[in-house]
Structure formats: structure tokens, C-alpha cells
Amino acid sequence: MNSITIDNDIIINTCSNFDNEQKKISLNTNINFIQFHFCLEGKVILNYNDRAYQFQLSENSSIILFNPSTNLPIDGELEKNSKYLSLLITIKKFHGLFSELTGNISFLSNENVDKKYYKENVISPQISTVLNQIINEKLSDNVKNLYLKGKIFELLGMYFNESNDLNIEQCPFLADEKNVVKIKKAKEI
């Protein structure tokens, strides 16, 4: 597992497994961190509390985990042909970034601040692009942390963006070119 500490509040962990067998992953955390886990390819299994809880993430899925009363160190497995990224960010840093949006992010609201939070999501093509940019960065050490911090902020902004007004014509990841043609024709009418 490749771990990069951006500062005391942000840690990125990446792991790829293109071997022919499962790869163990282990992350020590502390109670102050919100965990974001992203499976870009293959499958990852995340075990918590001596395997009492287990989350399986398939390709292009993610999960947010936060438990204000219990530390959540990770004991997991990365299946073969898999790519995984975790982002650990302190609740203090996260709350500082989103303080104006606490009403829009359910686990930051006053009534939920002391509650466990677990939520699975699908990774959008835009988020997948940012995740791959983080994983594949090849910058010199003097600008690496600045670049990665910017990408983390971009990732979080996209992750919590509630807008559904994406311009489908400009989406470079649109799987079906026929849909783009149909949309263009409909706009012309």
C-alpha cells in the first residue's frame, strides 16, 4: 500500500493488485478521521471490528465511513486485478471545508454529529478521472503535496456536488455515442 500524508489532516492510500491472488490491506486510523474508500477496478473487501462488519466494494463504487465513538482500523483484501484508493480526512478539516454546507451533508448536521455514518455511492466518470489522476501522478516532491491537495479538494467538491445539470455532450466518458447524436438532434428541434 502506498501512503501519502498531505498534512496532519489528510492521508491518501493507494493500492493496485495485478497479481494472481488477493492482497491484504491494512490501515491504522484514529477516531478523528472520516474514511472515503474508492474501488476503481475489481473488488475490495473492508473488514472492521475484528471482522464483525464487512463492506464489499465492487468496481466504480465508494463508501464513506465515520464513527465518532469507535476507531475504525481497516483489515481488508484487494482482489486480483483491482485498483483502490482511500482518503482519510479529519472531521475538523472536513467540517472546515464544508462549514457553509452542513445542512446539505447529513452527517455534519447538529443532530447527526455524534452518530455513525456509512454511505455507499457509485463513482461518476468525473470522479473516476480525478481518482486516476491522483493515483497516476508523477510530479516532483516539491509540488506533489500541493497538486494532491488540490485534487483532494476537487474530489470532495465533486463528491458532494448536488447538481444534476451536467452537459452530456461534453462528457468524454459517455459510453453511447448514439445518445449524443439524439441529444443534439433534440436540441435542434
Label each PLM-derived region with a short phrase.
Residues 2-105:
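N-terminal regulatory/effector-sensing and dimerization cores
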Residues 94-97, 101-131:
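A short mid-domain helix/strand-loop element embedded in enzyme catalytic domains
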Residues 109-122, 138-147, 158-188:
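Short, Lys/Arg-enriched, Trp-marked, Pro/Gly-tolerant hinge/linker segments that flank
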Residues 134-137, 155:
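Extended serine/threonine-enriched, polar tracts that run as long, contiguous segments within proteins
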